[in-house]
Amino acid sequence: MEQKQRRFTKNVFVLDQKRKTICGQIAARQSLPYCQIKIGRNFALRAVATPEPKGYVLEICDVGAYRIQDGNDVISLMISADGVEGTQERWEEWKFESDLMRTNGHSSKYKRSVGRREIKVSKGMGIVPPYTRNDFDRRELPELPGVQRSKYDIRELRQKIREEREKGAVEQPHKPAFKTERGMNRPDSDEDQNPAGGVVNDWTCETQKRDQEAERREALEIRLADNDRESKHSNWIVRGRGKILKEVKNSFRTQEVERKKSDMGEVIIEEDDEDSEEEEGARASYITSAYIERISRIRKIKDERLSMLASMMPQQSGEYTTTLFIKKQKWDNVPLYLIDEMQKKYELQSVGSCERVAFVSKGTNLIILPVASNPR
């Protein structure tokens, strides 16, 4: 048995200040402003002083057919001078004035307590008199251009459409994808219609399966060939990137070794004993420990003029690009250089003491040259 939808009790508080309806008359007899209409499993009328929380307040000025709409909740009321009739069900044979509810907050006394509550308010104009027949028949199909009326009602029409759809779904899997040449040129013979002649259909299905299998194998071979070609292309790209990466690493390693040699703050660090011995053997005899110690001290001072330059060891002879400044300092046991400021060249003279030190740059590298006082 189908379960009926449950209807909750709704409270409508009719405010008829002109006392033209039975609701206004009931409220006037009790000297109260509102007439409560309770609609649910039962129907009741009574006069009240204030509306209940979450109730519907309908302010009217005359008799009429009112339809209260609040979301999915619909309450239809016929309010006249001598009676009230209402329902929450469909009531389409009569015309109604639609009144949309607006939620408002208020403060009122309810059950001996005063507090803030929520009510929904709407105002009816009495445009539609009660029990006005609805001339429009929803069951009648209007005459529409390009549309022909079916001889079946809506239930029979839906059943017909459902049966045709199910019949098509059942017949479709057994329908052959193609017919033989004989079947395409002329209608099916009695032999084809005979159940004993199912050999032709079996042969047709077998041929179709073989063709589908051949197409599947061909598509698989094409996919495998494409994957193989993409794999080879990817391997070629990976090998090329690996080669470039290896060259970059070698170049970076060479620059790092040169930077370690030229960085005075880290020149004392030794990676292992063998590398240290090789570097000591390869290092020129004119680069003395006193010179290295002097340069280390200069780098630790962190002069702003030298902060953007990387330290570089001077060679026996070389070139530079810019003379930064010359400082008066007395150094002992350091390589001494002759400096040609016109051609911007320097050349090693000897190892000894100096009273001036030239700070020159070559690109982004800093070269510190103790200046020889007397030429050779």
From Swiss-Prot:
Keywords: RNA-binding. Residues 163-188 have a biased composition (Basic and acidic residues). Coiled coil: none annotated. It comes from the Viruses. Residues 163-201 are annotated as: Disordered. GO terms for molecular function: RNA binding. It holds the Pfam family BTV_NS2. Single-stranded RNA-binding protein. Belongs to the orbivirus non-structural protein NS2 family. This is Non-structural protein NS2. It comes from Epizootic hemorrhagic disease virus 2 (strain Alberta). The gene is Segment-8.
